[in-house]
Structure formats: structure tokens, C-alpha cells
């Protein structure tokens, strides 16, 4: 039997106090809508329909061609939102999952189990439920003495007995697709909120003696719907714990897992050691045996095997095996470091390729450069790559030696095995095997220091 999915993503999210649509707020690097959509993929839907409304083009852009879209101009309740999908799904045979786009913690495994339960029990409708210690604000699941679901009652419509019930509606359902849209034609706004409740279709099915079931989540956290920043922070905490636990199970050591931030798409190989206060974001890959020390920040980068990154920032860069970086280094976008390169403290590299075993140990800026292998870049070296309008390239050959406090004015080429003298300003090509000296000759004036006002001899 075919599966379909309807994702409800039309709401503004007033309690978020934000210009951003609620479902576009991020949890561990992905929007809530993306988390939900990835989980929905577990049921292999033939067609997914996303109901959009507030700032619809922003929401549409997140899923693009992965989903069909329908527009809910007025937000008149969950039942009304699902009605909008009628043009896409009416009359089709199959099972339809309905899920809110603000439930980022729901897992694909739970949705697959929900569908299987629905099919195996031959239900017309199956509600995903959970047991809440504090059910206030949730719709309650009302069962008869035989344990059968007879209705769902919203908090504002619940009587005193119903408000004591602990089993809550998570807002996720599976329906027989045809019967869903037939029942939606019968619901009304005769309730405390004056809205079309999707939950009213359960009462309709029961009145027709059709089978309604409930599948109870094992982990209550999966039921969390995010309506404000407090819930968003809770979702972030739970997701972060899931992510670090997944990596630990896969062989990663965290010295202080509560303090690290790792986003959903980060990949980490076994035998990596991660100290506290490390941030890994975007599409980052960390190779086996690598050590990331306290305070390291890496985004959208590939770090090879057996690297050591000490308290440094790395953005959109590629590091081969055995590279060492830091402390206090900054690798900016477009940086590529070959095997066993060393980038030391207070070194910045941007848009450059550095060959294997090259070392830049201290206080250096390398920008828009092609640096060969086994080059020594002395402390205080600056590649002067920008003239106020354009940027130019510096090329340094293999085994070159760049003396401390060298200023290399691009465009410039320093040949293989060439040397620049310490303190030089180099603006012309340095041929292979040459030495370039670009500084004034030292002039020493013996005894002249005594003429200075601060000299001790002047105070007598």
C-alpha cells in the first residue's frame, strides 16, 4: 500500500517573537522543517505535501522540489490546514501521515513503527500518543473501558476528568487517505477556539464504528512541539545529547560532552578525541585519530586523519593527514593544507594551498598564495595581496626559506630553494636558488645614544 505525507508548516509562530517563520528556526544546524522532512523519508512517501502560509516563499525554498506545496491563506486550525492538501491527495488509495513541521525530535524509526502499527491493526486512523507527566496544554486521549480510543479532547474543551488524563496527542497521525478527506468535509468550528480541529475526524470515525488506534511513543521527548524559545532550547539540548551519544557509540571520545556543540550533518571517524567547548558545524568531516582541543571551532571543513587542532578556527578548508594547527590560528575559506603542514600560533591563512611539510609557525598572514612543499615561513611574514581594488597571488616554490618579518608584495613568485632575508620587502621575482635582500643597510652611530633626552647621562 502506498504512503503519503502532509507536513503542516503554515503557522507564524507568534510566541517565537520572530520575523522568521517558526518552522525555519534551527535545531543543531537544520531547520525544524528539515528535521521533520528527513524523518518523514523513513516511511518512503509516494508524495509529500507541505502546507505553507506565513512567509510561504521562505518555507518553500527550504524543501524546494522535494515536496509539493499548498497554501493556507488563513490559519483556521489543523483540520483546515489538512483540507488544503485535498487537491493533491484526494481519491488516492493509501495511508497518509499528518505531522507538524515544528516537531524536530520525532525520529524516522518512530514514524516507521507508527505506519506499521496502523497497517497491522487495519485502522482507519492511528494517533501517535505519549505519556506526559504534566499534560497541561495538550489534547488528551480518551479511551473507553476496553481501552479503545473514542476521542481526542483539546485542553480548552476538556472537562475535569479529561484534564487528569496523562496520555496526550502528539499531533501526528496516520489515516486511510480516502476516509480522511471524506471525514474532513463533516467537521465544524463548534468548539472553544472556533477552529477546524483535525482531531474531530476521530469522533466521526468512531461514530461510524470504524477502527481508531493509538501508538504510544517510548520517548516522550520525541513529542515535543516547539512554540517558543524555551521549547527551542529544550529541543536543542535533546538533539545535542543524541548527536554526541551517536558519535560516542561510533568510537569518538568526548572529554566533556555537555559543553560541545556538534550539528546534525557533521561526520566524525572513530578514535577522534574532542575536548570541551568544541564547535563543529555544517558539512564537516573529522578523520580518524584527530585531536580537537578546547575552544576549537570548525565549520564546513574536511580534517584528515591524525591531525591536531589546538584552540583554532577553521572555515571551509581542507586539511590532509597529519596537519597541526594552532593554538590561535585562523584558517579562512578556500584554504588547503597538504600532509604534515604546521600552522602555528596567530597565523591566518585564506584562499591558499600549502604544500606538504611546510611550516608557518608564528604571527603570519598567508592570503591568495600557492606555497610549495617543505617551505619555512618565518615569523611575521605577510603576503600583501590587496591593492584596494584587486587581489593578487603569491607563489612560493618548494624548499624556499622565507625569513622572519618578510613582506611579500603580490603578484610575486619566489622560486624553489630561494631565500628571502629577514626584514625584507620583496616586490620582484626571486629566481630559483637565489637570495633576495630587500632592506636598507644598517648604519651604526657610536656614542650617539648619549644625546637622547632619556639617556642616564643626561640626568646628571
Swiss-Prot record:
One CC-aspect GO term: membrane
Binding, UDP-N-acetyl-alpha-D-glucosamine: 8-11, 22, 72, 77-78, 139, 154, 169, 227, 332, 350, 365, 376
Broad EC category: transferase
Record bears the keyword Metal-binding: yes
UniProt cofactor(s): Mg(2+)
Residues the record lists as binding acetyl-CoA: 379, 385-386, 404, 422, 439
Keyword Phosphoprotein (UniProt): no
GO biological process: cell morphogenesis; cell wall organization; lipid A biosynthetic process; peptidoglycan biosynthetic process; regulation of cell shape; UDP-N-acetylglucosamine biosynthetic process
SUPFAM superfamilies in the record: Nucleotide-diphospho-sugar transferases, Trimeric LpxA-like enzymes
Region N-acetyltransferase, residue ranges: 251-460
Cofactor note as given: Binds 1 Mg(2+) ion per subunit.
Compartments it resides in: Cytoplasm
UniProt keyword list: Acyltransferase, Cell shape, Cell wall biogenesis/degradation, Cytoplasm, Magnesium, Metal-binding, Multifunctional enzyme, Nucleotidyltransferase, Peptidoglycan synthesis, Repeat, Transferase
Subunit architecture: Homotrimer.
Protein function: Catalyzes the last two sequential reactions in the de novo biosynthetic pathway for UDP-N-acetylglucosamine (UDP-GlcNAc). The C-terminal domain catalyzes the transfer of acetyl group from acetyl coenzyme A to glucosamine-1-phosphate (GlcN-1-P) to produce N-acetylglucosamine-1-phosphate (GlcNAc-1-P), which is converted into UDP-GlcNAc by the transfer of uridine 5-monophosphate (from uridine 5-triphosphate), a reaction catalyzed by the N-terminal domain.
Family the UniProt entry places it in: In the N-terminal section; belongs to the N-acetylglucosamine-1-phosphate uridyltransferase family.
NCBIfam families recorded: glmU, PRK14354.1
Protein name, per record: Bifunctional protein GlmU
Organism: Streptococcus pyogenes serotype M28 (strain MGAS6180)
Encoding gene, per UniProt annotation: glmU
